């Protein structure tokens, strides 16, 4: 695992992440396999990013009648997939935190200016919560920053961004906008093409996830 502490970003180096990334990059990977790989990478990034979570402690009674002190997941986690591609991560992450509220923000990009436009937003209370923003493709950083600005205004306890791929400019923009955000990525790519797509990238993650 490599960490770029200057940008608060961690590149998660794991054989399963690398193999899934190979599938995601391959233009011949069919929809179902793409969705499975995206969910798998989301789960592995969440695994790494949640290491620092503060566990709650409680007591349970075992089938043998003994009382045991046990750890319990905190009820502070909020998952925030950015539509559409973030839904691909949600599938992999939600089984680990089934009761966590799911906030949703829908953002489209103007294809000429590449500026983000929010067309949908449902945010539960975020103050004091550990918010995980799911944005598989961190390209210009415009969409992520539009969300991060809204979330940080609600004063969460922590802010984490999970992405399969990040362009260096996207990482820098996120760090400039919300430097407290911890970023976990499968890989940092070379840059962006003229349409704002990540290079070498994996294409349009939302289209490939949903078969559109
Ligand atoms: N969104 C995508 O789906 N792919 C990119 O390369 C950039 C943004």
Label the model's feature ranges.
Residues 1-212:
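PRPP-associated nucleotide enzymes
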